[in-house]
Regions:
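Conserved short histidine dyad/triad with adjacent acidic residue
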Residues: 28, 42-58
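Well-ordered beta-strand scaffold positions
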Residues: 45, 70, 78-80
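Short acidic-glycine-tyrosine-enriched beta hairpin
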Residues: 77-92
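Glycine- and acidic-residue-biased ligand/ion/polar-headgroup-sensing regions
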Residues: 60-62, 66-71, 76
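Ligand-binding loop in jelly-roll beta-barrel domains
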Residues: 36, 92-118
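Conserved GNAT-family N-acetyltransferase fold
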Residues: 45, 64, 88
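A short, N-terminal "cap"/entry segment at the start of jelly-roll beta-barrel domains
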Residues: 1-39, 121-124
Length: 124
């Protein structure tokens, strides 16, 4: 495991489509992964206009930091309109979803804890 890591341009990191049932227009870039740190990961996620990650839950905690664009998150049974500068923490096993409701890309940094069970349970 390296002592440090520098990414000069996070937009240049390989993008992977979010591969869960019902996800559309969501792309993930792993900035810090298990090879860098066994405790948590840092990801940049880009959600295209109209794109979404459906209602789902997982055993790991997740924090969303909104950098650009606007969206709507469902967390448990509440709905939050998100915009740049906001931070949303989602506890383990808390149902949540995110959708881009704007006309530009929704860009968020997500931090997730690594747990024994990293599976995602889609609820819709």
């Amino acid at each position: 495991m390296p002592n440090y890591k520098v990414i000069n341009d996070i937009t240049s990191v390989k993008q992977e489509p979010l591969n869960i049932r019902g996800a559309t227009g969501v792309y993930t870039q792993w900035l810090v992964d298990k090879g860098d740190n066994p405790k948590y990961a840092v990801r940049r996620q880009v959600i295209k206009p109209g794109g979404k990650a459906p209602l789902h839950k997982h055993a790991y905690a997740e924090t969303f930091i909104v950098l650009r664009g606007v969206g709507k998150m469902t967390v448990d049974k509440g709905v939050i309109e998100i915009k740049p500068g906001m931070c949303v923490f989602v506890s383990p096993n808390m149902p949540h979803s995110i959708v881009n409701i704007g006309s530009e890309d929704l860009e968020v940094i997500t931090v997730i804890s690594y747990e024994e069970d990293m599976s995602i349970n889609v609820l819709e």
